[in-house]
Amino acid sequence: MATIADSRDIILAPVISEKSYGLLDDNVYTFVVHPDSNKTQIKIAIEKIFSVKVASVNTSNRKGKCKRTRTGFGRRKNTKRAIVTLAPGSKSIDLFGTPA
């Protein structure tokens, strides 16, 4: 396994869906992460980037869907998601930014 140098290379993007949006009230956040990262690296990266205390990290590997194209079949890439639960009393993460 290769080491990942920067925390921002581990956390790729937040997942914005109905399910993940509903979990924001419980201080549970979902992120797309680098496929080679482990739970410890994800926890350290979240704590470093957002200055919060992480209680737990759950990960899931998602297979890419097969999609039909004009020339045959293609495939979306496989992704890894991390569901991060913040510790009680920790400040929340502002994913959407403040309104202008």
UniProtKB/Swiss-Prot annotation:
Entry GO CC: ribonucleoprotein complex; ribosome
Superkingdom field: Bacteria
Pfam families, per the entry: Ribosomal_L23 (PF00276)
Residues in the signal sequence: none
GO biological process terms on file: translation
Record bears the keyword Iron: no
Molecular function via GO: rRNA binding; structural constituent of ribosome
Keywords: Ribonucleoprotein, Ribosomal protein, RNA-binding, rRNA-binding
InterPro entries (UniProt xref): Nucleotide-bd_a/b_plait_sf, Ribosomal_uL23-like, Ribosomal_uL23/eL15/eS24_sf, Ribosomal_uL23_CS
Subunit and interaction comment: Part of the 50S ribosomal subunit. Contacts protein L29, and trigger factor when it is bound to the ribosome.
Function comment: One of the early assembly proteins it binds 23S rRNA. One of the proteins that surrounds the polypeptide exit tunnel on the outside of the ribosome. Forms the main docking site for trigger factor binding to the ribosome.
Family indicated by similarity: Belongs to the universal ribosomal protein uL23 family.
Name the record gives this protein: Large ribosomal subunit protein uL23
Protein's organism: Mycobacterium leprae (strain TN)
